[in-house]
């Protein structure tokens, strides 16, 4: 969608690049693990080199779910992984781009948080804590660098149809007792999918592109729900 609007895009993921984008002249890709301490620096340096020295926007989209484990059942492995991917990696990427954005006296950052970033009743403790942390970091960056003409906002999507996230998870490892306490909350949102009004990836992408563009000038430190009113409960 960003490419369709004329943007130059540098993508990074632990998975391979989408095949349809491979030959696009304005798209570059680095296959890497964002949890590696060196990766954020490598990503930003490569982006600057390939696209003429500027970085106008950063979209922190990468993230992982937990298994809805509560504080009494979460493993160290799950906790560390969620914090590393959902919180530490985006902070490191922001740290790297801030220097460039301050020098060019402009820049827009958008972090993808979650409904779990503003609630304690929709996910496990690791995912919830990581997304709450990302919202806090978003507000801190927005306030700290507003005089440098740098904006930082976050979006909080609800469930997204067609992502296949839950299909990739081992249901046997889920905290079933915790899931029972969340059932009605999840049910109140999943009915949107049943009625054909569930959100799709493009419904999240459009607000992301708005916030990372100059069309959203003045919007800074905002936490935007994209969940068809799920955030009202």
Swiss-Prot record:
The keyword GTP-binding does not apply. NADP(+) binds at residues 33, 95, 127, 131, 160. Keywords: NADP, Oxidoreductase. It holds the Pfam family adh_short_C2. InterPro entries: NAD(P)-bd_dom_sf, SDR_fam. The keyword Transcription does not apply. Gene3D superfamilies: NAD(P)-binding Rossmann-like Domain. It comes from the Eukaryota. One of its GO terms (molecular function) is oxidoreductase activity. The active site is at residues 127, 131. Coiled coil: none annotated. Transmembrane segments: none annotated. Disruption phenotype: Impairs the synthesis of terretonin. Pathway: Secondary metabolite biosynthesis; terpenoid biosynthesis. It is an enzyme of class 1 (oxidoreductase). GO terms for biological process: terpenoid biosynthetic process. Its EC number is 1.1.1.-. Short chain dehydrogenase; part of the gene cluster that mediates the biosynthesis of terretonin, a fungal meroterpenoid that acts as a mycotoxin. The first step of the pathway is the synthesis of 3,5-dimethylorsellinic acid (DMOA) by the polyketide synthase trt4. DMOA is then prenylated into farnesyl-DMOA by the polyprenyl transferase trt2. Methylation by the methyltransferase trt5 then leads to farnesyl-DMOA methyl ester which is further subject to epoxidation by the FAD-dependent monooxygenase trt8 to yield epoxyfarnesyl-DMOA methyl ester. Belongs to the short-chain dehydrogenases/reductases (SDR) family. This is Short chain dehydrogenase trt9. It comes from Aspergillus terreus (strain NIH 2624 / FGSC A1156). The gene is trt9.
